[in-house]
């Protein structure tokens, strides 16, 4: 969009408007000025505090109470003493002086006020908050290095003399449906960048260029957790992120905004700093960046700052896209412009360069005689438009209104204020934290966008007492939401709900058509070059997938696409005899194809209050509030090779976990139980309505312009309690249910996962993610050495030495390792989502990735394990005790896992890539198998094409009418193992051409009970254990598990982790004892000897 290129234009073409500044020096200067102003404004204590005397004279400024204990003085590592100034103690001390008895006391020293407060937009400043654009981000993230950078940044801002810089960070927490087209274009660009990254690493083995920076998976939430650890105030937006950032900035008197988004420059922010140029010196004494002088920008462009809204509307934005303004932009250039020949090249829609458009539009806006008459301006802009002229003019007026809302109103209508910050003057501190009242939201500009007033409770304590919010505790003693001191003392009962619970039967149901805050017409923006067929031929897309009464019936069609309504052709063209074909510059553009979902089940008002409360304060995963209120989420893009069919996309890999989380959030299990009881009473069939949600994502074969419909799932093993009890329950059973719900969502509900002797407490979340990845039904994701690498780097002492890891040199990066790291961090992202949805059974201190993962360390150990084939002890830096921990964790991860599922067949659609808009239904422990009996995939990477499986390594024979006419041997690496049968292909006769398998020949064969023929049997030891799936460690092969021959019966379900009957691990899935292992080893040697003799 033209708006997004405005900041780059300022940096390159307006050198006088971009000046370097030192934020720490500015903070100290502002602090001294505030203290001097405080001394001049202060009244005599006797006049101010005499009984019955007024607080201040008319026209004077009342004394502002100082801040509570400083937020930036209690970091880990220490950055200065904590300052305590209590207002009540201050007044009481000076109230003791009585005139006439003693001479008046000297004036007290001025309180130490904060130097300056800067608001940081985390949505555009994530690369700098991560620590910069160093090349190690491609390995999956160096989280301890990021933690060290944020610690140094916070310590530098916390100046010990009271002249520090207070940082307040706001993360994007809104769904942003009105910017969906912009998000889709960004996803397509990130997909292309990911392919460039994978290709570069695969070909050269070196880190990609800095310009290809793609944020590591889960970066936003890792930064949020790190800032919470350092006691930095963190918030999340609720709807429109840009408007809420500007409203929060103006309401609380911040001295500057640190971001990298052109829209903030056009919002007329007083002090706008670039986060892209933010640099922290090595000694922590200088924090430099660039400041944009918008007054100088307006002078160089020949504009008045009051005309910035019209200028922003005509550049192209999310309301009025570039494609709708293409004809206007080309008309400004004129036919004699050197670039005019590009307008009709190959009959395609070509847009002028951004810098050329900015100059031309600025000249046009400066020549407007009456900028207030938007109707005249709109008609002049779209005078060459051949379709939808009125619609474009209306959206032009809405765009002007959108960008002028920040300059017209001092209190923006974007909802209530945050955490006790009130409207105050620039530079003044906020009100004390114990004086928080209701805040008026101002006059609404868009009525359907503005929520009602909400009375917020006192904010959480910041500083030494902030541990009350996230206290360190054991897993079994985790606090529920209701046990939070912030929530206990808050008047939740007096809250005014921001939604009308009596307006509908489903209070949290928001139709997708009304989601954009600027009305339904704002969604007619352009789309990117997606994978959708016929993507540029329709004008307006109406709502599709109308609500069906039998939505839950999988045999029925879930809806049909509505025919596009061509409302763009004018009435004059319809009246002509011949059809009118508009030009490409005036044709309407397609935004996205939304789908209407059935109404969501109702959610308890207490749950929604807690969800909104924690969402605004950055204490909860943002997906949760979106799911409860809108029933849809957006999934970011991560690094994945679209040409590699071995690894699934992250959006599909962790979809099953998200489906279970949806079931937990909407209390689907309790609903089903109530419906079953009601059906039994009335003797009617059970009809449980399905809960359908929308997931917006982009991966191979999936365009971001269309959502996927996903249904919520329930646990089969037990009935999860409702969300209110899961979040607000205080009993010990409720805590156990929270933990069990989290483990069930991650398919890790086994006893050994909660045994600290097997899985350390701080590594529980990591082991749950790895166990989930091991159980992927579409094929094997992790080999054994890769699983050991994840575990070995988690227990390594080098994990907490970022300086040493920074000096670590990796000769050639492993492309598969980069994708595995991205998948793992996407799993951590999903685990954080599940943990917050289940009531946070895992404390936030144990969720942070810097305690169990480092991408660069993982790469170095993966190269040792994969290429150099080192032993497990060498992989653990020569420490046998660490190798023992890795073995125990591996056993816990593989406990009860059935690895006998075959890879997807080439003749059948792969279960890995589900077609769009089809919900992926994967049960808990039962996965659908491909038709026929297929052997396990070969160990290691196959050299064949994806989907084509090599000849079975056990060999086989060809039978015609029951007679063996041909026979072939298998590979020497797997010949004679006896674990899998020989492949038999029968043509004619009883087999009817179907393939079958026969077991290999052992030392003592026996006849199999089969009428068609006989085959070699297995040994008695294998016969004794037939049908059991054992998780046995394979010594030197690359396979993750070596399984014995089974009769394909389902394994016995493993005992749950929190069973009342027993707290011990289930012995039914333990490893084989040593005598059985020795017997199996001898038997394998005998089988191999017999097979070699037979071949000779």
Swiss-Prot record:
Residues 540-559, 1041-1050, 1076-1096 have a biased composition (Basic and acidic residues). Keywords: Isopeptide bond, Methylation, Ubl conjugation. Residues 101-113 have a biased composition (Pro residues). Residues 35-113, 508-579, 971-1096 are annotated as: Disordered. Expressed at low levels in a number of tissues. There is a cross-link at residue 1042 (Glycyl lysine isopeptide (Lys-Gly) (interchain with G-Cter in SUMO2)). GO terms for molecular function: RNA binding. One of its GO terms (cellular component) is nucleus. Residues 35-59 have a biased composition (Low complexity). InterPro entries: Coact_PPARg, PIN-like_dom_sf. Residues 82-95 have a biased composition (Basic residues). The modification Omega-N-methylarginine is found at residues 58, 977. PANTHER family: CONSTITUTIVE COACTIVATOR OF PEROXISOME PROLIFERATOR-ACTIVATED RECEPTOR GAMMA, CONSTITUTIVE COACTIVATOR OF PPAR-GAMMA-LIKE PROTEIN 2. Belongs to the constitutive coactivator of PPAR-gamma family. This is Constitutive coactivator of PPAR-gamma-like protein 2. It comes from Homo sapiens (Human).
